[in-house]
Curated annotation (Swiss-Prot):
This is N-malonyltransferase FDB2. Pfam families: Acetyltransf_2. PANTHER family: ARYLAMINE N-ACETYLTRANSFERASE 4-RELATED, N-HYDROXYARYLAMINE O-ACETYLTRANSFERASE. Induction: Expression is induced in response to 2-benzoxasolinone (BOA) exposure. Expression is also induced in response to 6-methoxy-2-benzoxazolinone (MBOA) and 2-aminophenol (2-AP) treatment.
């Protein structure tokens, strides 16, 4: 029998009092992501009703998404360095973590927070769920033998409505994510981080009990092509699939619990941290910096190089400060279990 007291309230969406950030909080956030003055002059910031328009709402949506990806890391440090090893998806606590403490988070943290930011600016936002493709698995045997399959529901993204169509907004897939808003259209294809291309298709996934795979339930499938060609021989990598169904906080509570506690989860096994790199003059993302376990790599276009190899835990903590602007507290530095520490 559990010795915990019975809960008096369970997770839900508080429809009568939905989470929003104050104007002062939003201004603090825009400083954290270093949004340039030309975007701070957006008419949306003076009249929130304009957030629904493509003329005013879309440019600001693109800018905030890009600057967020380049200044708020995709990281799982809480699961390794914190004393509690737990994740919160409460928007109030996420503001404290991301804006006050200058940290980041995984998909559900980053996209819950950013969705709340956009709603606070007046945007119409729907939270959705996805399945990450096993072609993205960090485990070689899984990539080799199960690349055509998908995980269970373990990813979060946002849909933002502008005038007459939805736009996909996702800052929670690290270096393989779109990191730019794009329309929810079957067959849509665009360059994301040159020369990389992304596409969106509505199709059944391979796993289905349907007698004919083509009769399976269709999902929106987001794919990435790392090396586009002109002869039609492009290789598209399944990245994740998602549905337009609205997911609620209690859905993400279940999803986050699994991905943050399961010993087979990528997040519980490896320390990782990613920030995107942008060319501010061209207003586009050109690459990323990623820490994976003990190595930091910089990728610009299709060129990748090792920036730093960390031999000790002290070196990894210092690299988080110098390269990712992430400062762990003394408690966090001592929170990593001995068996996970670098020698």
């Amino acid at each position: 029998m559990s010795c915990l007291p019975e809960p008096t309230v369970l997770t839900q969406l508080w429809v009568d009092n939905p989470p929003r950030y104050s104007q002062a909080q939003l201004q603090d956030y825009l400083k954290v992501i270093k949004l340039p003055q030309r975007f701070l002059n957006s008419a949306v910031l003076k009249d929130s009703s304009l957030a629904h328009t493509k003329e005013h709402g879309l440019p600001l949506l693109k800018a905030i998404t890009r600057y967020h990806a380049c200044n708020v890391p995709f990281e799982n440090l809480e699961l390794h360095y914190s004393a509690h090893k737990t994740i919160t998806l409460d928007p109030v606590e996420l503001f404290e973590k991301i804006v006050t403490r200058r940290r980041g988070g995984r998909c559900m943290e980053n996209n819950t927070f950013l969705g709340t930011v956009f709603r606070s600016f007046g945007y119409e936002v729907r939270d959705c769920g996805g399945r990450v493709a096993r072609a993205m698995s960090p485990y070689p045997d899984v990539r080799k033998n199960q690349a055509y399959t998908y995980d269970g529901w373990n990813h979060m993204l946002n849909l933002v409505y502008l005038e007459d169509e939805w736009y996909v907004v996702d800052v929670g897939m690290g270096s393989m994510g779109p990191n730019l808003p794009f329309p929810l259209r079957h067959g849509f294809e665009t360059m994301s981080i040159a020369p990389r291309k992304i596409r969106l298709q509505r199709r059944p996934i391979a796993e289905s009990h349907a007698s004919n795979p083509t009769k399976g339930t269709e999902l929106w499938c987001y794919d990435v092509c790392l090396k586009p060609t002109k002869d039609g021989t492009e290789v598209w990598i399944p990245t994740y699939a998602f549905t337009e169904t609205e997911f609620l906080p209690q859905d993400y509570e279940v999803m986050s619990w699994f991905t943050s506690t399961n010993p087979r989860s990528f997040f519980t096994r490896y320390v990782t941290c990613t920030k995107m790199i942008q060319d501010e003059e061209k207003e586009e993302i050109i690459g990323n910096l990623t820490l994976f376990k003990d190595t930091i790599r910089e990728t610009i276009g299709n060129q990748r190089k090792v920036v730093r190899e960390c031999k000790t835990e002290e070196e990894r903590i210092q690299a988080l400060v110098e390269i990712f602007d992430v400062n762990l507290t003394d408690e966090e530095k001592n929170g990593l279990p001995e068996e996970r520490r670098l020698a």
